[in-house]
C-alpha cells in the first residue's frame, strides 16, 4: 500500500501540471493580461516584492472573507490574477526602463486600453491603463507601470470587474476617486 501511494503521488502531481498550465494560458489570453517580462528582464535583478495571486488562491480568499465583507468578496471573486513586482535598486537604468515602458504603453494604446494616468516629471515615469469592455461596463484589466530612480513597480490586475464593483469598494473604504469613477 505504501508503495502504491509513493507511485501515485508523483503521477497525480504530474497530471496536475497540464491543468495549471492551461489556467495560466487562459489568463494570458484574457484581454486584461499584460506581459511585463521585457521590463523584468531589463531590470536584471530579482524583484524585492513579488506578489502573484491566481484564481485558486483568490477563490479561497473570497470564501474566507465572504461572511465578513460581502462587497470585497464579490470584487475579489471577479479577479483572475493579481501580479505585483517591485524592484528597488539604484542600479536600474530608469531611462532604459522608461523607454521600454513607452513601447508597452504604445502597444496597450493600439490594443484598445484606456490610459487614465500619465506622468512624465523629472525622472518619474507613470502610466495607468484600464482595459474596458466595448460598452465600458466591465474592466478586464488594470495595468500600472512606475519607474523612478531606485524604484520600478509593475502591477497587472486581470478579471471581469464592473465599474459598480469598484464604486462599491470605494464607498466601503472611503476612496472618493473610486466612488466617482467614470470610465466612459
Outline where the language-model segments fall.
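Early exported N-terminus immediately downstream of N-terminal targeting peptides
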Residues: 26-103
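Extracytoplasmic
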Residues: 44-48, 77-81, 111, 123-125, ...
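Sec/Tat signal peptide C-region and signal peptidase I cleavage site
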Residues: 18-26
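Bacterial N-terminal signal peptides
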Residues: 9-18
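Short Gly/Thr-rich strand-loop-strand
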Residues: 106-133, 179-184
